[in-house]
Amino acid sequence: WFTHPGIQDFATGMDKSSNFGTLDIIEALHWVKKNIRSFGGNPENITIFGESAGGHNVLTLLASPASNGLFHKAISQSGYTSSFTTIEAIGVDSNGKTINSLGSDSILNEYNASSYQNIKNAYLENPKKNADQYQKYLRSIDGKELFETYKLIADKTFHRIPLATRDGVVIPLQGIQASL
């Protein structure tokens, strides 16, 4: 949310991420969980809700391991997600270090590790020269198998609590696969 090279030089631990807004919300949820009984609430039945940017915050909390156990249901109204550059979507930097654990790198490694590793390494070695080859490889993947692989990874990551986010139009009630 707020990052500046000057902050990064002195930041440690979680502050190094510069996700101060998300970290503040997580701290607030710790407080809620600790104190909710004083207000007649149940610390084992906490629902979070957000609209627009708040909906985005809900989705961010769902993706953050630091928020595990702090809430039990989530509602994201008009929340949004961000798109990634090609490098971010692949999920690794030029040194092969993971920068996006749910990027296409994780999914494609699950899908077909050996052939994907070869094409990914060629792309990372020279993105301009090998972009067409990488894109051709991605277009050759069977969509059904790829979505099944994505679903396996997503089930491990995101389906830990009930989430209200669909409207039946933007995301069909049958899920994203039904729209393809």
Regions found by a protein language model. Name each.
Residues 1, 63, 86-87:
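Non-catalytic cap/lid and distal C-terminal segments of serine-dependent acyl enzymes
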Residues 1-26, 34-38:
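Cap/lid segment of the alpha/beta-hydrolase catalytic domain
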Residues 32, 39-51:
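Alpha/beta-hydrolase fold nucleophile elbow
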Residues 41-44, 56, 71, 121, ...:
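Short secondary-structure junction motifs
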Residues 48, 70, 75-77:
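A short, hydrophobic beta-strand element of the alpha/beta-hydrolase
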Residues 55-67:
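Short glycine-enriched nucleophile-adjacent loop
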Residues 68, 77-180:
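Substrate-access "cap/lid" subdomains that shape
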